[in-house]
A protein has these predicted regions:
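S-adenosylmethionine/decaboxylated-SAM
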Residues: 1-128
Length: 128
């Protein structure tokens, strides 16, 4: 995240949940600059909650850096209900719709879509 106060709020929530700070790595920077530099297969959980127009690129990076059995969580996957409305054809909505369709057909991940709130897409990377 680019916002230091959001990172601090996340750290506080993790401590409150009993998760040791050493178990989490938070990186400040734009996803487009940071993700390409991250090591393959090194993370248990990757949260994609960034520039919606580039969601597919970020998920691809997320799957690359997630270990086998790791999860990529995609926030706002339903885009305020726009994904379910076939009349909505803007670039962002179409990207999320394509992402959901693609991962549903993929053998590389086990996917689950929660329709609660604005939607959360969970992609668990299958072992190789």
């Amino acid at each position: 995240d680019l916002e230091i106060e959001y990172q601090q709020a996340a750290r506080d929530a993790l401590v409150e949940a009993g998760i040791a700070p050493s178990r989490v790595r938070m990186i400040s920077g734009s996803a487009s600059a940071v993700l390409p530099k991250m090591n393959d297969g090194s993370y248990d959980l990757v949260l994609v909650d960034a520039d919606a127009a580039n969601v597919i690129e970020y998920v691809e990076h997320g799957l690359r850096i997630a270990r086998s059995g790791g999860t990529v969580a995609v926030a706002r996957a339903l885009q305020h209900g726009r994904v379910a409305d076939p009349a909505k054809r803007d670039e962002v909505t179409s990207a999320y719709r394509a992402l959901i369709t693609e991962v549903a057909a993929s053998d590389a991940v086990v996917s689950s879509l929660s329709t609660a709130g604005d939607g959360l897409l969970l992609l668990t990377k299958r072992g190789i």
